């Protein structure tokens, strides 16, 4: 497991403990002796939101009790995406947890008043398990790299089944995830989001490459556009696994939409190839993990939707990732990808 804190912002955890203790006391009227312990940032994961783990202790009805918790704070200066979907993230997690169709942590409290911690935040239950971290890459070192082929196979299948389960969630009642009037849902919504993203980073020298990428994709518009919920950052690294390599929880719902079923599958297979596929660019090849074709076949079997035209959605995934990389370049001051490499990635020169 990585020892590196990758949070976009950090704060004094003793001060946070004091503020949250008082805040929780007002929300737990039956509790006394409220105390927070073991506050810490996740290691090797959690780059988009400031996320802090802690254990909540209290006394209620004469009994000592405790609950593992996570506080997730809305991004401030370090904003990776142009759309503020923090409220939608919380509401979707609440809906998914209530339905039980996808393994999502329970949101216990949601605070919209920024005066408490400087920005809105929510507190959810802390699940116990292990995360395939990005830093260092899970395929190179750590528990996934050290697992047996059979264990990795179990992990891969469990992950794909949860990915597919998202596409069995009815969209009724999720209208709060809709986009603007001209692109309320479906591919139009997800497309509109990234057209606006490219415009958001228009002053970057990579912007002409991104625009060319959009033009290429538009000229090849896919026929297959199955409806479905978009998780967003759909990858093994945003799932937690237990000692049996089964999925405990699906995490990081920060960019949801009603944009269609194939975006998450495309993102998942693209990241899988990058992290642990035969041509892994960031991680290393891991035997035991299912191939792209096996992933697509299992996903179709579980969710019952067609993955036709997936190649287009994979190319769109590369455009999305390039947008994110350009924004991170602006935030960090270091070019995430050479421009020539971006042109090759987006197939525009």
Where do the PLM segments sit?
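Activation of the activation-loop gatekeeper triad in protein kinase-fold domains
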Residues: 251-256
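Protein kinase-like catalytic core scaffold
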Residues: 69, 103, 122, 228, ...
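All-alpha amphipathic helical-bundle segments outside canonical DNA-binding/catalytic cores
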Residues: 178-182, 305-317
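Juxta-kinase regulatory segment immediately upstream of eukaryotic protein kinase catalytic domains
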Residues: 1-36
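Active-site activation/catalytic loop segments of kinase-like enzymes and analogous catalytic loops
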Residues: 263-304, 317-334
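ATP-binding pocket architecture of kinase catalytic cores
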Residues: 40-210, 221-224
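Catalytic-loop of the protein kinase fold
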Residues: 229-231, 236
């Amino acid at each position: 497991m990585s020892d590196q804190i990758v949070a976009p912002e950090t704060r004094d955890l003793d001060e946070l403990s004091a503020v949250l203790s008082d805040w929780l006391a007002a929300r737990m009227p039956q509790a006394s002796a409220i105390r927070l312990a073991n506050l810490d940032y996740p290691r090797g994961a959690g780059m988009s939101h400031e996320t802090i783990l802690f254990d909540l202790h209290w006394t209620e009805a004469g009994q000592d009790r405790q609950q593992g918790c996570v506080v997730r704070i809305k991004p401030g200066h370090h904003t990776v995406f142009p759309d503020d979907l923090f409220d939608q993230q919380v509401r979707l997690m609440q809906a998914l947890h209530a339905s039980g169709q996808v393994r999502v942590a329970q949101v216990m409290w949601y605070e919209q008043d920024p005066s408490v911690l400087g920005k809105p935040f929510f507190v959810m239950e802390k699940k116990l398990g292990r995360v395939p971290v990005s830093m260092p890459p899970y395929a190179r070192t750590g528990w996934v790299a050290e697992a047996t082929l059979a264990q990795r196979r179990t992990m891969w299948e469990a992950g794909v089944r949860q990915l597919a389960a998202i596409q069995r969630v009815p969209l009724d009642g999720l209208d709060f995830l809709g986009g603007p009037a001209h692109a309320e849902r479906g591919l139009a919504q997800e497309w509109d989001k990234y057209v606006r993203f490219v415009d958001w980073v228009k002053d970057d020298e990579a912007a002409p490459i991104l625009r060319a990428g959009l033009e290429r994709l538009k000229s090849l518009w896919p026929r297959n556009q199955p409806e479905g919920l978009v998780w967003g950052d759909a990858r093994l690294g945003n799932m937690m696994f237990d000692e049996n390599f089964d999925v405990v929880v699906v995490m990081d719902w920060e960019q949801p939409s009603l944009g269609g079923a194939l975006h998450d599958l495309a993102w998942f297979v693209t990241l899988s190839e990058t992290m642990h596929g035969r041509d892994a660019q960031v991680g290393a090849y891991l035997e035991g993990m299912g191939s792209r074709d096996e992933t697509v076949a299992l996903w179709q079997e579980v969710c019952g939707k067609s993955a036709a035209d997936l190649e287009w959605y994979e190319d769109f995934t590369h455009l999305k990732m390039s947008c994110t990389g350009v924004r991170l370049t602006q935030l960090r001051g270091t070019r995430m990808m050479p421009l020539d490499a971006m042109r090759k990635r987006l197939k525009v020169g």
